[in-house]
């Protein structure tokens, strides 16, 4: 397999497998890969001692919060080869994992099981209605039931609810309230190599769901916030009369300054 796909630019890590054992055959597989490609690291969550980087599957949030501080002596860099199982209404706790992972430069992230629901069109024999068919819907026995329906996308690649949660958590810039009475927010540039100068930063204020201050430009962070840096900035609320009985939200948008 390595020979067949070695020139694919999208491949950055080789994996020795998923959910198998720690046998000596994996040591030999690692050696074989290195005779072909020494430019990419190799991971294998069942035996971190024989590969180039650390990994595991489905750790608790508490474990990740400890591991990023060096509590467990894990091998860096670290990549959680599976940490979320997108079945049903899942992946609602991603932000807790990522707040821990993004607190260090040594955790590379993790992989979600998986991208797309694996089903095909089937039809109700009575009504003729079309639906997504999977395990058992075609009279197949034995089958794995709905364990092929784990995606953040439907079989036709339309997004499920999980998709929007993942998109939000995986965004390259983070914004956090620090002191909203005084308009202070924190901007975190999650990128590893580029500052925020490619973006126009625009914020709007909403009162009880209605926009009361629109498209205000925040120019300072564009050049000031470098890769992996956090800085506080003040929104100019001097022209707004805040009502103690109202609910307020600030929407901050990062728009490309130039078309790309």
Question: Where in this protein do the model-derived segments appear?
Answer:
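Substrate-binding/catalytic cleft of secreted carbohydrate-active enzymes
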Residues: 1-150
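Carbohydrate-binding surfaces of carbohydrate-active enzymes
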Residues: 100-260
